[in-house]
Regions:
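Acidic/polar-rich alpha-helix caps and helix-coil junctions
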Residues: 1-65, 76-181
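Residue-level signal for threonine
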Residues: 70-71
């Protein structure tokens, strides 16, 4: 709890609450709340691709062929006005054996600086973000029986992510579930 709290209170890394800044931060690997990400400098200096989620070799709309489509229970973990939902999910036409318009995970669209023509779905891995420190602090406080402190950290995170979020007090199992979700 103390280590996470020191990072949160240090002020160097702040939660991003602006939807456009959040989406651009994931696309361009410029998310200001990132404590550490693996650096890549161009098309010849790449890590893993995340094409599993979208996979579109032509770059044309309507030709997505994902290997993974999130189920409703995953999508339901996010409020529709949550800036994470807006940045990480998109309704797309797909051309797998199932044809239609589905909500896909687009969290790793590919940083334009890391490809030359059609996206390669490579983004710099964001290994640690301050948002995770809020969840670590909430979980640590909950494990110590400090539900009010845990609720504060969880609510601080949700206020930054979900416009019009109303703070609430969590306790017991409801607190644990809220942190994990």
């Amino acid at each position: 709890l103390l280590k996470a709290k020191s990072i949160i209170d240090g002020g160097k890394y702040r939660l991003v609450s602006d939807a456009q800044a959040f989406a651009n931060g994931w696309l361009n690997d410029t998310l200001t709340e990132t404590l550490w990400q693996v650096a890549m400098t161009g098309p010849d200096d790449l890590g893993n691709a995340y094409s599993y989620f979208i996979y579109n070799t032509s770059g044309k709309a309507g030709e997505d062929s994902p290997r993974f489509v999130p189920e409703d229970w995953v999508l339901d973990l996010y409020a529709k006005n949550d800036i994470r939902y807006q940045a990480w999910f998109s309704n797309r036409d797909i051309t797998t054996p199932v044809v239609g318009n589905l909500t896909l995970l687009v969290k790793y669209p590919g940083n334009p600086k890391l490809y030359s023509a059609v996206t390669n779905y490579v983004n710099m891995p964001k290994v640690f973000r301050v948002s995770e420190m809020y969840l670590i602090a909430a979980e640590a406080a909950a494990n110590r029986g400090e539900d009010i402190v845990a609720s504060k950290y969880l609510n601080d995170l949700k206020v930054a992510r979900i416009p019009d979020w109303e703070r609430r007090d969590y306790t017991g199992d409801n607190l644990t579930v809220a942190i994990r979700n």
